[in-house]
Design a protein with these regions (language model features):
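Short helix/strand-capping connector loops at secondary-structure junctions
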Residues: 131-141
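Small/polar glycine-rich anion-binding or flexible loop at a beta-alpha turn
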Residues: 116-119, 141-146
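Positively charged
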Residues: 1-108, 139, 146-149, 155-171
Length: 171
């Protein structure tokens, strides 16, 4: 952690019965902004997401962590700062539903602080901090751009709002 403070994060796939879990193809490169040693030997880390990547190959090793060869080719736009066509006003309904969901789940969010960030950072932070399932967060991570991610968040929120944000399974 002393070198460049970069780490790649990839979620395991759900429903895996192997002792070594299969990984999703898409992950995110993050920069460690702070970390703390916990008394039980774990680390508590804060990350800033930099760019998404695709796993091209997993490298076998005997380490306590997994290593992969990755490509940023599909997500080159993550590295370019660009003006988004969306405005905060385009997201009023989504923010209203997210606030309801976060309150229902007991999350405390500083909305004023979020609105000071650029729209892309705000949407990404809310998507990853949300009480969505790992599969739902993976769908958001893989969304190609902010407009698609906004629409996916709206779709996910509509399933939660159906049962007043209790997220009970409907069959």
């Amino acid at each position: 952690m002393k070198a460049d403070k970069l780490i790649g994060l990839i979620q395991p796939k759900k429903g895996n019965v192997n002792s070594i879990l299969d990984l999703h193809e898409t992950g995110c490169l993050g920069k460690i902004t702070s970390f703390k040693d916990m008394l039980d030997g774990r680390y508590l880390i804060d990350l800033s997401g930099l760019a998404r990547f695709k796993v091209t190959k997993e490298i076998k090793n005997n380490k306590s962590y997994r290593e992969c060869e990755i490509s940023f080719e599909d997500y080159q736009d993550d590295l370019i700062v660009k003006k988004e066509k969306l405005k905060f006003s385009d997201l009023e309904l989504i923010f209203k539903d997210l606030k309801s969901l976060f309150e229902k789940k007991g999350y405390i969010i500083n909305w004023k602080s979020l609105e000071k960030q650029n729209l892309n950072e705000t949407i990404n932070a809310l998507a990853m901090a949300s009480p969505f399932s790992l599969e739902e967060k993976q769908i958001l991570l893989e969304s190609q751009n902010l407009e698609i991610r906004k629409n996916k968040i709206a779709e996910i929120l509509s399933t939660y709002s159906y049962d007043d944000f209790n997220n009970t399974t409907i069959q």
